Amino acid sequence: DRGKLFIDKRMYRPALEDFQRALISVIPSFEANDNFAVPEIQNENPYFLTIIAAHFNKGDAFLAWFNREKNPQHLEQALRNYQAAYHQLIVTRNAMGDELSKPFLMGTFQKSIEQSVTCARQLYGATHNARYFQDAFHFVELTKYLNVLDALQRAERANNSGIPKNLLLELKDVR
């Protein structure tokens, strides 16, 4: 991904421009004159994963830029993009169901998910505003939500597999 290469080279503006272009290209109603604009959550869009990735990537770029230059506006923008990524992820998960599995999401966005919690914690540490503390908890809760959905899907598959429940419980005890 070109934008990630820009982040690695500490070229944050071109990285953000790249991620913003990705959003503009897949959301017909979204127009942005700068890299700070965040589009509304999309209820129906065939490019859900591109949208989620662009939000997480913008958050990562703003966080890296903050860590380099200590501009609090960059930290705020990182948080806004992480929030948008999580909200889009929930809408997408509800729309797609099993096709958007927790292992796929965690594998694809693990670093960004961890950085989102770090971002909220840094904002809380800098401002002591309880809202940012709530954001950190909210991000952790959303990660737990993905874990619960994955566990429910595994349980449903086990119930529909024809395997007697007592054997499944024995297997659990063996683990």
Functional labels for PLM-detected ranges:
Residues 12-175:
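Amphipathic alpha-helical protein-protein interaction segments
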